[in-house]
């Protein structure tokens, strides 16, 4: 049995019922193009292939799993895998114009980076069923006025409908992680609020790095003066004495557009 690489965040699932539960969270797999990150020995890959997808492409960084994945590829003509760094791979380099469903037990040490990268390729994404550390999943789904609500919540919710599916205890994995895990379903939104992305990112960075301060203080460097800031806040239905965690994604989006024109 191969030794697991902690540096790569390797925690695999071998229980078929759990694997099926993950796949069932997707709207549909049969006839769809599927993308998987962190294939390992191919347990999730094999379970997906039994659902008859149009194609499945897996990425695995650890070349020690090449033999197992090559064996799987020999059994299924609609399966391919690549050994490489998922952070460096764009969907458009693996799929042509097809809409892609991403199903993955993500390596927790790069999960957020992967998700934010896919936020820039959503025109090619049908939906995503992803495993996260529970703490990260809670941040993604968090609502305004909650302690977990932050920049990640806003960036994801402006692009996708985020739905928590179920939690998995550490003992489901081999080796078991020290944290509970959560599977999320993320569906790209068809109608999105216009926003100035660079300004929005600056608002989120400034605001949430000083989340306990009133907006009139935390966002003071975004606008030319306090009058402009107060006017912008009034236009989005916010008060200068509010904290940024009280503003919903729509308000923050609109604020970025007003700041752009200021």
Swiss-Prot record:
Keyword Lyase: no
Binding site for S-adenosyl-L-methionine: 11, 13, 38, 60, 85, 105
SUPFAM superfamilies cross-referenced by the UniProt entry: S-adenosyl-L-methionine-dependent methyltransferases (SSF53335)
InterPro entries: KsgA/Erm (IPR001737), rRNA_Ade_diMease-like_C (IPR023165), rRNA_Ade_Mease_Trfase_CS (IPR020596), rRNA_Ade_methylase_Trfase_N (IPR020598), rRNA_adenine_dimethylase (IPR011530), SAM-dependent_MTases_sf (IPR029063)
Enzyme nomenclature, EC number: 2.1.1.182
Reactions that this protein is recorded to catalyse: adenosine(1518)/adenosine(1519) in 16S rRNA + 4 S-adenosyl-L-methionine = N(6)-dimethyladenosine(1518)/N(6)-dimethyladenosine(1519) in 16S rRNA + 4 S-adenosyl-L-homocysteine + 4 H(+)
Similarity annotation: Belongs to the class I-like SAM-binding methyltransferase superfamily. rRNA adenine N(6)-methyltransferase family. RsmA subfamily.
Function as written in the Swiss-Prot or TrEMBL entry: Specifically dimethylates two adjacent adenosines (A1518 and A1519) in the loop of a conserved hairpin near the 3'-end of 16S rRNA in the 30S particle. May play a critical role in biogenesis of 30S subunits.
HAMAP family: 16SrRNA_methyltr_A
Name this polypeptide is given: Ribosomal RNA small subunit methyltransferase A
Encoding gene per record: rsmA
